[in-house]
Structure formats: C-alpha cells, structure tokens
Design a protein with these regions (language model features):
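A residue-level marker of the well-folded mature domains of exported/periplasmic proteins
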Residues: 1-212
Length: 212
C-alpha cells in the first residue's frame, strides 16, 4: 500500500533549515473553510477545548484566532492575509482548495509565518501538509462497495466537497476502485458537503429525477 496520496506534491520542504525568530507564547490563526458538518465541528472543539488549554498551560500558546470563509476561496485568501497582518505567528488551514491559496501562503511565508494544512493538502511548496492518503481510503470504499453488490449494479457516488483536496482525492479513489469491476456502472454523482442532512436531501432529489 502506498501511504502517500498520488495527487499530493512531494518535494524537499522549504522549512528544512527554517528557524523562527519568534519566541513563545505564540498566537496561531486558524483560517477555517467550513464548520457546517460533524467532523469539522469536532475538529474545532478539539482544537479550542483540548489542544488550546494544553498549549497555554505549557506556555507555548497565547491565543488561537479563528476565521470562517464558508467555502469561499477569495474570502479565505483575504482572511489569511489579514491574520498575517494582525501579527499571528503561524496559520492552520484544513481541507482547502489545493491551488487557490498558494499566493496567500507565499504572502505569509515571506513574512515569517508558516502555514500548516492539517488534513488535505495544498500545492504550494511553502506550506506544510499533514494528510492521510485519501485516494487509498476512497479506493478501499469503492472496492468494498463493488464487492458488497456482487461486482454488478448501478452505483450513485456521494462525494464530499468538490474542489477541495481531501474530497477530490477520495472521490478519485472511489471511482478508481469501482472501475476495477466491469459489471459496475456509476449512474450519477452528487455532493453532500460531508453533512448527513445534505446527503439525504441530495440523494432524495437525485432518486426523484432518476426513477428505476
């Protein structure tokens, strides 16, 4: 099993010999793209109610400043630049557009502010990406589904948030897994924003317009 997502760029890190000239306690910005599903809410809760107090107790953290862009790339870019201008020492992002933020990441890097993507990835050589292999995860889901229906049948693929690295990689993996079974036909794709209520509504709409 390849542990690296084939869509994630790999190269020598720009931070290999980098050292910050800033001393703790640090102020960290979290430029969140979305908080409308259970996973994102859980990640926010853990960051603010578990990690933040522990870091503060250790004397490493002053505060975490949170922004929300609600899946608007232009707004997230603006918020990243504003966080840099406000004097944060580092920025966290999550499940972002893989290319749209690259100039904002460079803006931060040029001013001594590292940007960390803690799940998903960007294509900027100036960000630090920490991510699982979403393509492999999707492939495993696709092959499992194909085997569950006996290698034959019509499949509706419900993906996450199109245009965002983790979602796109996972969706590509699902389709790759399903494609290994000639008897499987992908009859449609819908997006559910990784939110169960949206998934139910979108599935019902699709079924209503595709009877039989």
């Amino acid at each position: 099993m390849d542990l690296m997502d084939p869509m994630q760029p790999l190269d020598e890190s720009a931070f290999r010999d980098w050292k910050s000239d800033r001393s703790p306690p640090w102020t960290v910005g979290y430029a969140s793209t979305y908080a409308g599903n259970t996973w994102r809410k859980g990640a926010m809760n853990r960051l603010m109610n578990e990690i933040k107090p522990k870091w503060q107790e250790l004397g490493l953290l002053n505060d975490i400043i949170v922004t929300q862009s609600n899946l608007k790339d232009a707004l997230q870019i603006q918020q990243i630049r504003q966080l840099v201008d406000q004097g944060v020492d580092a920025i966290i992002i999550c499940c972002s557009n893989p290319t749209a933020l690259n100039q904002a990441i460079k803006y931060a890097f040029d001013r001594g502010v590292p940007v960390f993507s803690f799940t998903g990835y960007t294509t900027s050589p100036l960000s630090v990406n920490s991510s699982v292999n979403y393509h492999q995860a999707g492939f495993d889901v696709g092959t499992w589904m194909a085997e569950e229906v006996g290698g034959e049948g019509n499949i509706l693929v419900v993906e996450g948030i199109p245009g965002y690295s983790a979602s796109d990689s996972q969706n590509a993996g699902v389709l790759d897994g399903l494609s290994r079974y000639p008897g499987i036909k992908v009859t449609g794709q819908i997006a559910h924003m990784w939110t169960s209520q949206v998934g139910q509504a979108e599935t019902q709409k699709w079924l209503a317009t595709h009877p039989g």
